[in-house]
């Protein structure tokens, strides 16, 4: 698993003439996307967390790209006109922490090459292809062990061609440091040396291997002829290859698990690893830190993770966060609030339930009267009641609970990573969530974001639950970077990728996307003549509960099958004697997909005489 990449992008691109006078050649577009941006997208999809771009000519373009992709760090090679790729790599090297992917900026390539390098067990590896006939080949020679022994554009200088240099490599931090040391010592005579030539120099003492993909689809683009070749010959091959690896798209409009990106799905395809290895412990530690940082200050809060569903996280929270002699007050204004109360009853926790309408706002005055009527130690509420899409005003409710001395435990399962949340500002002490809703991971990891001060109070409390005990899990993880019991390994890799993609989009922009999808749906419902259960001003923008049409011709199963046949999954919903169906805006749903769905919905409703 490689966390960093370095793109060497300092060159002038002079072989393009006027085209690159005022623009780096990495910004030449193929099918509407700049080469370097396409590369950035592929690196993110491959799980790279930070991309360092060494810039020079027209560096402002790359600085602008960094504003769009938050994982990019630009480093300027001030002397780019008098150096070559090694000079640019030198200025980037101090920011490389571990093994990194090195790339040139003017490459068009099949993303499978990144997968091949990541899955090569050797520390230092050069990606090579078979014969390309590009007329700008860099030939590689290897010894009997596959170690690089020669690099040249002159084929006559190579005894046996092992492959052609692609311009994508994997190097360790130690190998990179040796490259920089060599360059520093020989700068006077080697100012314009290329990085691949330095590979050969270092390989004499520290091996770098060649990984050849015979029929690999790629090209470097250095001039107009290469650009024409890329557009007509290479890009169509790359596009076809990558299209073949796409997973069939099913848009889940159910309230979780949500639609995931292909990169999240593929993130599960990793080498087998014992979860007790330090490497995996480090991954879980980083995931925990990132999950915390989305909603709270990691210095004051921490995230405790379990192999379980969101309900498992709720159970961990309820069973762990009420003191032995404590009393719990639960708000029930939907199925998920009722579930919190049910969990408490199973554990024999003394509990009062504040019943509220499932589709109208909570009566805050009545709730406060309930809070002050008895001495409660703990208060539990659902932020986004997924049954209906009703958003409870935690910004008012939790401070009210704190006023009466209660610890606040909140189900934030269907709000986490879908909307901006500041747990400290909202005065939430514990928040339960899951890997398979707005965060965009796969089902299987439940977690509780905990205020450390409150969590530490549980140290000497008797355990009501063994597997789901918050403090025991927290303590063990702090000491070992391990969960007490076997974690869902592949699901953690998928969650790591989902976190990378959440950081890139940002939660604020994600909420905007969900809101746009919600508006498209609401406008379509009005046009069709269908009514929503919850008033618009009280909706979360994540779930819309829709009253079923008053006609005997309506059949949810037939509507479901009609939508499913066109790639959309919908979900029923029933509240007592109120019949509804629900449409969710979660996960990797796009506005254009919601438009397509509303067209399908209109078509079905028209077929039964509703519109």
Segments (PLM) and residue ranges:
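Conserved N-terminal catalytic core of the sugar/cofactor nucleotidyltransferase
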Residues: 1-7, 15, 33-100
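Active-site phosphate-binding strand-loop segment of PLP-dependent enzymes
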Residues: 361-415, 430
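Conserved core of the sugar-phosphate nucleotidyltransferase
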Residues: 110-188
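Conserved N-terminal alpha-helix of the aminotransferase class I/II PLP-enzyme fold
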Residues: 267-316, 320, 335, 339-343
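Conserved alpha/beta core of the MobA/IspD/sugar-nucleotide pyrophosphorylase nucleotidyltransferase superfamily
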Residues: 2-5, 164-244
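PLP-dependent enzyme catalytic core of the Aspartate aminotransferase-like
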Residues: 579-611
